[in-house]
Amino acid sequence: MAIERITDNKFELVSKYEPAGDQGEAIAELVDNIENGEKAQILRGATGTGKTYTMSQVIARTGKPTLVMAHNKTLAGQLYSEFKEFFPNNAVEYFVSYYDYYQPEAYVPSSDTYIEKDSSVNDEIDKLRHSATSSLLERNDVIVVASVSCIYGLGSPKEYQDSVVSLRPGQEISRDQLLNDLVGIQFERNDIDFQRGCFRVRGDVVEVFPASRDEHAFRVEFFGDEIDRIREIEVLTGQVLGEVDHLAIFPATHFMTNDDRMEESIAKIEAELEEQLKVFRSEGKLLEAQRLEQRTNYDIEMLREMGYCNGVENYSRHMDGREEGEPPYTLLDFFPDDFMIMIDESHMTMGQVKGMYNGDRARKEMLCNYGFRLPSALDNRPLKREEFESHVHQIVYVSATPGDYEMEQTDTIVEQIIRPTGLLDPVVEVRPMMGQIDDLVGEIHKRAEKNERVFVTTLTKKMSEDLTAYFKEMGIKVKYMHSDIKTLERTEIIRDLRLGVFDVLVGINLLREGIDVPEVSLVAILDADKEGFLRNERGLIQTIGRAARNSEGHVILYSDMAKALDENDPVDKEILDSGYYTEYEGQKYKITRSMKHAMDETARRREIQMAYNEEHGITPQTIKKEIRDLIAITKKTDSGEIEEVDASAMTKKERKALVKKLEKEMQQAASALDFEGAAQLRDMVLELRAMD
């Protein structure tokens, strides 16, 4: 039975802050553009200007159901927590991949190795995914924070909605009919272990535990063949929390199909199987034909008997009634037509949207070619970028450095440059590569005397290692962060840098999440003139931004200045006319286009910020950020003090006990919706296990 979506709920933004700096102008401009029907626009906001708050204000003022996309689970978790705080009275949902571990099905012909799909599902995230889809079908005041997994196939929203079991007191329905209906939407009867997606029966009472809940269930009490009343109960204690007038029970799986559609689907699968077997046999591929026939017939038998089989998603084209090549249903299809999309860190996220389809296609083609899957499995896939675009009603790309794709989509750019703290973008200067290390040593000593920290970025692992060794010889307290360092160690390194255990951090990519240190007053970029990843315009602006959280922020770009430009030389004259040069000690030197654009953009922002501060009498203050002991494994002593534990010095038994304790904390963090904390605890557990 279909349910009607409530359409008159309003977003209610709860915040102790009012828009500050240029947030008010940015909010007004974004809202005006949306109300005037602008399809796409960019919010180009400098680091630390409060873009999430601006996004929240826009959602509240436009009142549209909104999908907020991020490029990884960590960032999505941070955004989800922030939006939950801003909108405590609305439906803020979280939709990311529910796999803690995922090994996709694959075949490697060179070694004749078939790798079966293997995965472990995070029950908490599965609950949140169900909560997201049910909220979208029940109400209009919904914000879903999602990773790129929202463009993967999810099952038909119409089938999902049509399968909802709707119950009201006084409704005529027999108890046995309700039990049949619940089994039909993939609920399991379990009178002993009562958990999500289950129901239990006690005489004339049926208790149902929805897939979107984790603590509360519903008790349906019958009088004959009529529902007497429906109560909400606490699962653990059985305590009655109140009576409800209407209960909508959504399916326990997103992949729903009715009996008639199932028979049609099986007929189509059998027809496709026959067709493909003919192809294989005509090509002399008898092994592939035998393999495909055996595997597919087993799946068909399971579908007939159970309505489900392992890898059922590979038959989703037939189940959904789609034509070959048609895009799958995704989370985007659960939204109403006039919804809004906001893409956070769009320069990263849109690249992922583009890349998902190709990687998936290559793996599946191998499975189809060797008889592990029917060709229709190719239609169980993520959306192509152009298919994603076809779902867009109105979209806001949010980034400090929008990508080429976003810039091609729209000319409407809304800027947010002023930080509420008054902090300015750092001063950027170019210095010669010749003698750069000795020059840098002098700068490091100046910062160390003022108890400030330094980031140094290099191009290669070897250079980082050599530089770190040299700095150590010079008596500088330094550490090197490379890609092999695990999450646990990485966060410990950042904490030690902030505490002053060492003064300089050397690395190649210092743009990862969590590398956010207000104590850093100098960022030195070596080989800044070597174009490429992290030395292009966006990479340079993002790296320069690492010094924007300190009032003394300063950035030095070291570049090749072996030869000064001569305006009498035709080639040099061309460079001078193009503007791609810098002045140093009275001479002009060539710099890259990326360096020039990054420096000009930083200088432009700094000028606007300084003018604003002067007009409003604001003095920039370095951000005061608490140094949390996020990663160091700790335990409370009897006196209540926290004592650090050196895991490497523990016995195997002690480590086992610690793993147990951390797993418990991880579950608690996940239940409290602190997904970033839970992820860090998970990484600790994995690393502790690796020690044994």
Curated annotation (Swiss-Prot):
List the InterPro entries.
Helicase/UvrB_N (IPR006935), Helicase_ATP-bd (IPR014001), Helicase_C-like (IPR001650), P-loop_NTPase (IPR027417), UVR_dom (IPR001943), UVR_dom_sf (IPR036876), UvrB (IPR004807), UvrB_inter (IPR041471)
Please tell me whether the keyword DNA repair is annotated for this protein: yes
Q: Which residues bind ATP?
A: G45, A46, T47, G48, T49, G50, K51, T52
Any one annotated GO CC term: excinuclease repair complex
Q: What is its main location?
A: cytoplasm
Q: Where does this one sit in the cell?
A: Cytoplasm
Q: What sequence ranges are listed for the domain Helicase C-terminal?
A: 436-631
Which SUPFAM superfamilies does the record match to this protein?
C-terminal UvrC-binding domain of UvrB, P-loop containing nucleoside triphosphate hydrolases
A Pfam family annotated for this chain is UVR
- Which Gene3D superfamilies does the entry mention? P-loop containing nucleotide triphosphate hydrolases, UVR domain
Q: Which GO BP terms apply?
A: nucleotide-excision repair; SOS response
Q: Where is motif Beta-hairpin found?
A: 98-121
Q: Which PROSITE patterns match?
A: HELICASE_ATP_BIND_1, HELICASE_CTER, UVR
Question: Under the GO molecular function aspect, what terms does this record hold?
Answer: ATP binding; ATP hydrolysis activity; DNA binding; excinuclease ABC activity
Question: Which keywords annotate this record?
Answer: ATP-binding, Cytoplasm, DNA damage, DNA excision, DNA repair, Excision nuclease, Nucleotide-binding, SOS response
Show the CDD domains listed in the entry: DEXHc_UvrB (cd17916), SF2_C_UvrB (cd18790)
Positions of the UVR domain: 656-691
Q: What is known of its domains?
A: The beta-hairpin motif is involved in DNA binding.
What family is this?
Answer: Belongs to the UvrB family.
Assembly, in brief, is:
Forms a heterotetramer with UvrA during the search for lesions. Interacts with UvrC in an incision complex.
Functionally, this protein is described as follows: The UvrABC repair system catalyzes the recognition and processing of DNA lesions. A damage recognition complex composed of 2 UvrA and 2 UvrB subunits scans DNA for abnormalities. Upon binding of the UvrA(2)B(2) complex to a putative damaged site, the DNA wraps around one UvrB monomer. DNA wrap is dependent on ATP binding by UvrB and probably causes local melting of the DNA helix, facilitating insertion of UvrB beta-hairpin between the DNA strands. Then UvrB probes one DNA strand for the presence of a lesion.
What protein name applies here?
Answer: UvrABC system protein B
Species this protein is from: Lactococcus lactis subsp. lactis (strain IL1403) (Streptococcus lactis)
Identify the taxonomic lineage of the organism of origin. Bacteria, Bacillati, Bacillota, Bacilli, Lactobacillales
